[in-house]
Amino acid sequence: MVRTIAFYNVENLFDTIDQEDTLDEDYTKDGRNHYTSNDYKMKISGLSEVIAKIGSKRTANGPDLIGLSEIENAQVLFDLVDQPALDSLSLGIIHKNSPDRRGIDVALLYRQAVFFPLEYDNVEVQLWDKKGNRIYTRDVLWVHGIMDAEELHILVNHWPSRRGGSSESSHRRMKAAWVNKKIISRISQSQPEAKILIMGDFNDDPVDDSIKVGLSSKSKGQLNPGDFFNPMEKMYNMGWNTMVYRDQVHLFDQILLSRPLLKTTDNSGFKFMKAGIYNPEILIAQEGKYKGYPLRSFQNGKYSKGYSDHYPVYVQISKSR
């Protein structure tokens, strides 16, 4: 039995309604991106077709769990799972609003026939600037559930950006890593051998301190209790990427696995099988400034009929029936 667990930054999945409490004016008909209802319908249809095919070379059903970032609200999630391309997955939604000043959240979609949520919560990442003013960013979404009679914990992230410079902003992402470790510590008190997956757009690469030190990312042969294996590090070292930022390619989108998902002594439970970046030709820009990079949704002040400025990533785990 093989299950696919994915993560996708869907690049500003906003509806076209101007909400008073969020900075969403750019994503309206009269806003900077001249974003219409037809644009929204096209974007959400395209995203649904992409999601349905993630990991499909190995399984016929599409992904079983899908973490998302840059979604505006619950309504866009309902619209997304209601698309014909996702009908067969019968996806449930886990989402809570974050205090992010842009109005974007993280969420988890799950196949209701496969995954049963037990509990979930948002955990704040509290940040302040040099003047002591609060910086509002995305919460970490923690989900605890059962898949094929086995407990899993999923942490969905979208860490603070590199705005202001990578080094200057690195402490913010390290704080987000610390929040993850705090959640993991709490889980481990009652479940020392918990199977945990940390996923997200980390705005850092697999070799950066927030991942290597903050999340205790190690290679397979060096894992101690509390450490995590990051299959995306090898991909990064091979030159693979999921997005471009300021003319530099990066692999910000990652999924890490706790040590119990790497053990080979117990054949009865889920084990890591493989990881990948889903980037078929349809998701790659064929011309223009971003040729060879993800076919983004918005360019030059308009919807450009693309999908996202990130590629989705996934891991596959397997177990004996």
Over which residues does each language-model region extend?
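Structured beta-strand-rich core segments of catalytic domains in phosphoester-bond hydrolases
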Residues: 65, 71-151, 159
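Extracytoplasmic/secreted cell-surface and envelope-processing proteins
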Residues: 75-78, 102-103, 163-166, 205-210, ...
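Metal-dependent phosphoester-hydrolase catalytic domains
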Residues: 186-196, 203-321
